[in-house]
Amino acid sequence: MKDESALFTIDHIIKLDNGQSIRVWETLPKKNVPEKKNTILIASGFARRMDHFAGLAEYLSTNGFHVIRYDSLHHVGLSSGCINEFTMSIGKNSLLTVVDWLTDHGVERIGLIAASLSARIAYEVVNKIKLSFLITAVGVVNLRDTLEKALEYDYLQLPISELPEDLDFEGHNLGSEVFVTDCFKHDWDTLDSTLNSVKGLAIPFIAFTANDDSWVKQSEVIELIDSIESSNCKLYSLIGSSHDLGENLVVLRNFYQSVTKAALALDDGLLDLEIDIIEPRFEDVTSITVKERRLKNEIENELLELA
């Protein structure tokens, strides 16, 4: 899978039997640091593409991690489908497909980092797949409550026939009928369903909340942590952050540093974040961000030409 001649991000395509494809980006560990035991898989939050996590991938690779990112099907980004057909189950199946692809390519140790809505998906599958550890950031635990906060109305209380055609979620049109139907059919919507999914969790787990997050209640994340019988989990707060971890450079850098420390700690079987990291140069983070935006634009243009 690795291409040592690549200058920066390596682009992969997972082709599915139904003709759809999932785009995957690979970032190799920097050559001047010892390579870590685990490959990091990043699941982006809702309405976030994998190139939005270029900085985090740079931090992790600078500290010796092999990093994988992907765009879900029927989501923003480079994979197949339209966001108005996105459901939580499609997000789940996209994640499982990438995990299977990594396994098929000989990657045996995976640490999963999931943000926001993707964290709810991670909680759903964490006991069903082989992971070394899990890290979540501003992870959704009560989907219905988060949707009500984000949309400023509890649309899940309405009969399916009375839903508007689309829900405007962070500037994107989410198909209401298909999304809500899936939420109820597969029990995505409640805090209790999340607690049931993580019951018996045994792998190391670190959760980050944001102290100014109006979409996720810290008390419910604490309830999630408390419901896990294992002592191998810990909760940290990103001070000064809202649910939008990229709202400014100070918040963003704190997010990168904290998650990188968590990954390094968990790679060594620890939960304590009192750990030193190698800080990539600001110019390097900026450079890779610009390069990945160009790569994204090039791929989008190629896809348009093929359409």
UniProtKB/Swiss-Prot annotation:
Give the annotated active site. S116 (charge relay system), D213 (charge relay system), H243 (charge relay system)
Keywords of the record: Acyltransferase, Luminescence, Transferase
Q: Example GO biological process term? A: fatty acid metabolic process
Q: Name one GO molecular function term.
A: acyltransferase activity, transferring groups other than amino-acyl groups
List the Gene3D superfamilies: alpha/beta hydrolase
**Pathway this chain belongs to:** Lipid metabolism; fatty acid reduction for biolumincescence
Q: Where is the signal peptide?
A: none
Judged by the first EC level, this protein's enzyme class is transferase
The answer to whether UniProt assigns keyword Acyltransferase to this entry is yes
Q: Which Pfam families match?
A: Acyl_transf_2
Q: What is its EC number?
A: 2.3.1.-
The family line of this record is:
Belongs to the LuxD family.
What role does it play? Acyl transferase is part of the fatty acid reductase system required for aldehyde biosynthesis; it produces fatty acids for the luminescent reaction.
NCBIfam families linked: PRK13604.1
The protein here is known as Acyl transferase
Print the organism lineage: Bacteria, Pseudomonadati, Pseudomonadota, Gammaproteobacteria, Vibrionales
